[in-house]
């Protein structure tokens, strides 16, 4: 007679390895663990990992591909045409924050890439098919950049935003968010962020974006025109 319990499908070993590596990176950092640390909780020996991946770097590149796939879906167009571009961008930036908070290992891998622009191993760069200045045109992130550019252009045509280079805008919001997540400490990554912390992070990012896109370059943090002294 059926027990009534649903069977949970066992993940392939390759996926289990990637999941454990993701957990370790979030907790210990990109260089804070060994393959033995990965193998132990899975109940396997290190040679078993080499049946699926050529090296530790190969594991990290494959994990990066997983994150790049998720990142490629950011800044999607509004489901309904005619929606206010500013409201859509605000919502997409909130989702951008959620993506980073939900994937702390991705944040740490991003910081490694920024820290090794030449030399070293740039895992996300390899996974995305090239350096950041090339990804708007090639590779899996091209669609994300295309959607962001279209959203910014819609805001410009609606008289909401000034004209900006989409990649410049992306670099600004990305950099501000990374700094917000790790400075002064990385408690937003290692712990469970409170609703207040999440709301403050989203508010900060939207404020930066709003000021950068403002038609009036003298717009201050309160949305008012700064007085020249």
Enumerate the predicted regions with their spans.
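Alpha-helical DNA-contacting segments of helix-turn-helix folds
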Residues: 60-67, 144
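Amphipathic alpha-helical packing segments from all-alpha helical-bundle domains
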Residues: 76, 87, 118-158, 167-171, ...
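Short hydrophobic clusters on alpha-helical segments that form packing/core surfaces
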Residues: 17-25, 67, 71, 96, ...
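Amphipathic alpha-helical segments used for helix-helix packing
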Residues: 101-131, 182-187
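Hydrophobic alpha-helical connector segments
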Residues: 62, 76-108, 169-173, 202, ...
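C-terminal peripheral helix-coil segments that are non-catalytic and often amphipathic
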Residues: 1-2, 95-98, 142, 146-158, ...
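Helix-turn-helix
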Residues: 12-16, 24-58, 62
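Short, Lys/Arg-enriched C-terminal cap helix and immediately downstream tail that follows
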Residues: 61-62, 72, 181
């Amino acid at each position: 007679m059926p027990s009534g319990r649903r069977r949970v499908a066992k993940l392939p070993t390759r996926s289990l390895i990637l999941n454990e590596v993701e957990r370790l990176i979030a907790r210990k950092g990109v260089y804070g663990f060994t393959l033995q640390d990965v193998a132990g909780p899975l109940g396997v020996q290190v040679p078993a990992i080499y049946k699926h991946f050529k090296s530790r770097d190969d594991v990290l590149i494959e994990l990066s591909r997983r994150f790049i796939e998720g990142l490629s879906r950011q800044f999607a167009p509004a489901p309904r045409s005619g929606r206010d571009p500013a409201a859509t961008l605000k919502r997409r930036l909130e989702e951008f924050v959620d993506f980073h908070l939900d994937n702390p290992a991705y944040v740490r891998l991003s910081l490694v890439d920024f820290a090794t622009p030449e030399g070293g191993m740039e895992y996300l760069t390899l996974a995305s098919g090239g350096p950041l200045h090339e990804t708007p045109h090639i590779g899996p992130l091209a669609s994300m950049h295309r959607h962001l550019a279209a959203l910014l252009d819609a805001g410009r045509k609606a008289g909401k935003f000034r004209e900006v280079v989409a990649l410049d805008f992306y670099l600004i919001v990305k950099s501000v968010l990374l700094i917000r997540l790790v400075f002064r400490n990385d408690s937003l990554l290692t712990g469970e962020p409170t609703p207040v912390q999440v709301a403050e992070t989203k508010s900060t990012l939207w404020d930066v974006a709003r000021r950068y896109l403002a038609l009036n370059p003298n717009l201050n943090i309160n949305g008012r025109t700064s007085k020249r002294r």
